[in-house]
Amino acid sequence: MSDRENQLGDQGLANLAIDPDVLEKELAAEQLSDPLDEIDCDQEVDETLKAARDCDAGLQLLQSGPENRLQGLRVFCEHRDPRAVPLLLPLLQESCPIVRMSAVYALGRNPSPVAVEPLLNLLQADSNGYVRKAVAWSLGNHSDGPVLTPLVKALQTDIAAVRLWASVSLAEAGGKTTAKADLAAGQLLLSLAIDSEPVVRSNCIWALAQLIDQLVEPRRTEVVEALVNALMHDAESSVRDEARVALEQLENPEILERLQALIDEGFLS
């Protein structure tokens, strides 16, 4: 601040008539922290404490008998706590498919290297499709493990519900390296071309869009051409819409120009 500004400020203060009561209230208010900051802080602390208490209760429920297991499993489908993993793993062998399925989802929420092999065994051998579907989802959160090839096989051969989640998890499992991305993209491209379920084809498109930055030529061009082909020729509008969104999100000038040409020529609206 300049000398001139200081002088004007001093003169202005000298001419103020200050009400002592008002000044006292203002000074007291200045000692308080921002109420919004206090609310945010309190909410964060409350949520952390609540999660910790929920996890403690969940651990007790998992250990207090079969009648309470599902309640405990619901806790760890929502919260992460490494203490739960040793209690969840034995539940993968339970005779009740709901318990197995819930344990799988909880392990997806609480990924651990020791869970990979038991989950892969379920994906291969469990007779219940809902359990295998849960495994296909959960393995996407265990992408550092050897899950890529089993997910490819599930996308090739399993029921539609499992294929749906296998395609999504392949985007996670294939995103680690260029080689894995290429392997995952190969099966996703095949399934996009031949799978009978529109929702599976749509998920294949989504997964390919997630992987494309990891791919090298000529695979990258193959993916783009497959997306254009789906946009132009797939029988289901939902799949065509997914392909268009994926192509637009690539933000590649040549691809955007190509889409505009299709619009201009009347092939797209």
Positions of predicted regions on the chain:
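Generic detector of intrinsically disordered, low-complexity, polar/charged segments
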Residues: 6-9, 55, 105, 137, ...
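Compositionally biased amphipathic helical and low-complexity segments enriched in hydrophobic
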Residues: 24, 28, 212, 228, ...
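N-terminal "cap/leader" segments of large eukaryotic alpha-helical scaffolds
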Residues: 2-65, 70
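Short inter-helical turns and helix N-cap capping residues of alpha-solenoid HEAT/ARM repeat scaffolds
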Residues: 64-65, 95-96, 127-128, 158-159, ...
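Short, highly charged low-complexity linear segments
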Residues: 131-135, 162-165, 180, 229-233, ...
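Amphipathic alpha-helical scaffolding segments comprising HEAT/armadillo-like alpha-solenoid repeats
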Residues: 48-62, 81-93, 112-125, 144-156, ...
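Structural detector for internal amphipathic alpha-helices that build alpha-solenoid repeat scaffolds
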Residues: 28-49, 67-82, 86-93, 101-112, ...
